[in-house]
Amino acid sequence: MVKRTHGYRYKSRKLLRKKPRERGMSGLSRLLYEYKPGDKVVIDIDPTYITTAPHRRYQGKVGVVVGTRGRAYVIETYLGDKKKIVITTADHLVPYQGGS
């Protein structure tokens, strides 16, 4: 028997896939949106940009922008009861529209 690999994108076949109508380049408004520290964002991984994508466990998580590092944003989010820091670009962020 051969041991199966458990790579960085393991078990993400459906999660990191675009629907046929979403294929192609993302809209410019998503990329040009400026986030300020304190803004709430949703981590929505865009599978087109692999190098700056956060781990799949953060897909759909709501976080708060803490600051920037170059072109990337530093996001503070919770994973269970632990506070985590995610560093990613605006390609994988969407402004939070929900309640509190």
Curated annotation (Swiss-Prot):
Signal sequence coordinates: none
Region (Disordered): 1-22
Name the record gives this protein: Large ribosomal subunit protein eL21
Single Gene Ontology BP annotation: translation
SUPFAM superfamilies registered for this protein in UniProt: Translation proteins SH3-like domain
GO MF term (any one): structural constituent of ribosome
InterPro entries: Ribosomal_eL21, Ribosomal_eL21_arc, Ribosomal_eL21_CS, Ribosomal_eL21_sf, Translation_prot_SH3-like_sf
Family per record: Belongs to the eukaryotic ribosomal protein eL21 family.
Organism classification: Archaea, Thermoproteota, Thermoprotei, Thermoproteales, Thermoproteaceae
Bridged cysteine pairs (disulfide): none
